[in-house]
Amino acid sequence: MARISGIDLPKNKRIEIALTYIYGVGLSSSQKILEKANIDANKRCKDLDDNEVSLIRSIIDENYPVEGAAKRVESMNIKRLMEINCIRGKRHRVGLPLRGQRTRTNARTRRGAKKTVAGKKK
């Protein structure tokens, strides 16, 4: 089983798909990595030899912020938006959708479960 950036890649999947299990590596970047490493995208993870794995590992370490580094960059960007008080930062702070979605109905994922309010007594 190949271990890259602290993630055990699934051995029966194609290497192109297996690389997407690493946070910060999507399908397009995994295709670029394999193209740069000159490895067939249809090859299974279990069929990779050690120098191919080390080549992929070195390409990812040099060119891509992955796992903790990518999460750190993302959280710093959100924190920066909140500090400069732009509309996206304010929406992050309040926990509402950022990109113009309606909030009168729906938006349950972002707002959380319904908070029931006691009805008025007559």
From Swiss-Prot:
Residue ranges of coiled coil: none
Keywords: Chloroplast, Plastid, Ribonucleoprotein, Ribosomal protein, RNA-binding, rRNA-binding
Any one cellular-component term (Gene Ontology): small ribosomal subunit
Annotated InterPro entries: Rbsml_uS13_C, Ribosomal_uS13, Ribosomal_uS13-like_H2TH, Ribosomal_uS13_bac-type, Ribosomal_uS13_CS
Location of region: Disordered: 102-122
Subcellular location: Plastid, Chloroplast
Primary localisation category: plastid
Keyword rRNA-binding: yes
One Pfam short name: Ribosomal_S13
Gene3D superfamilies: 1.10.8.50, 30s ribosomal protein s13, domain 2
GO biological process: translation
Stated family: Belongs to the universal ribosomal protein uS13 family.
Quaternary structure (record): Part of the 30S ribosomal subunit.
NCBIfam families tied to this protein: uS13_bact
PANTHER family: 30S RIBOSOMAL PROTEIN S13/40S RIBOSOMAL PROTEIN S18, SMALL RIBOSOMAL SUBUNIT PROTEIN US13M
Function: Located at the top of the head of the 30S subunit, it contacts several helices of the 16S rRNA.
Name listed for the protein in its UniProt record: Small ribosomal subunit protein uS13c
Organism this protein belongs to: Guillardia theta
